[in-house]
Amino acid sequence: MPSGLQIACVLKRENPKDILICNTEKNLKTLKKGARVGTSSVRRIAQVLNVRPDLKIKSLRGNIGTRIKNLYSGKYDAILLALAGVKRLGIIPRNSNTLPISTILPAAGQGVIAVVCRKNDVQMQRILRNINHLDTEKCVVAERSFLAALGGSCQSPIAALARFNSKRSFLFDGLVSVSYTHLRAHETEADLVCRLLLE
C-alpha cells in the first residue's frame, strides 16, 4: 500500500470460496483427463493440481465477463474464479460448483471489500469506522499478518482463511502451497492464532 494510506474499515465479508465454472461438466471430479483449466493464480494452480494433477492449466486474464465468455467459447474446459466477484455482479453461471475450503483454501482477504483513506484524515477515519464490520476486520488482520510474516504477496502460493464459528470460536486455516503445509488453529484471539501458526 502506498505510504500515507491505510485501511480505514472493511465491509462484511462475502463468501470467500472459489468457484469452478465448467463448459460442459459440473464439477472438478468429472472433468475429463487433461481438461484445460483457466487460472493465473499460483495459489489456485497448486491446490487444484494437488487434487487433479492430470489437468492442464492455461493462463486466464481479463475481467470476469471476459473470462466467462472465453470459457463458453471453448478456449477452456473450466475456469476458477473467486465466488464473491461473481456474486457481486449478479452472474449465475451454468455448470458451476462452489469449491469447499478443504479442496481450495482462499487467498488472504478474499471476499472482503476494504476502504482506504489517508492516514492523516482523522475525521474520515472516524466516519468510516461506523461501517466497519468488526468480525471481518479481525479475520482480515489474522490473514494479512500470516501472509506478511511469510513474506507473501498476491503472487505467492499462500492461502489463509480466518472465521468465527457458531460458538464464537476463532478458526484459522493457513496453507503454504509450495510445500503443501497445511496449518490449522482453533483459538479465541486473532493475534494469538497468528503467533501459534508462525512459531
Where are these regions (language model features)?
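Short, solvent-exposed coil/turn linker segments
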Residues: 27-30, 100, 188
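Generic beta-structure capping elements
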Residues: 10, 23, 118, 175-179, ...
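N-terminal segment of the mature folded domain
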Residues: 1-2, 86, 194
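Small-molecule-sensing regulatory modules
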Residues: 50-184
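Single conserved hydrophobic/aromatic residue that forms the stacking wall/gate
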Residues: 182-185, 189-199
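Alpha-helix N-cap/helix-start and coil->helix boundary motif
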Residues: 14, 45, 64-65, 189
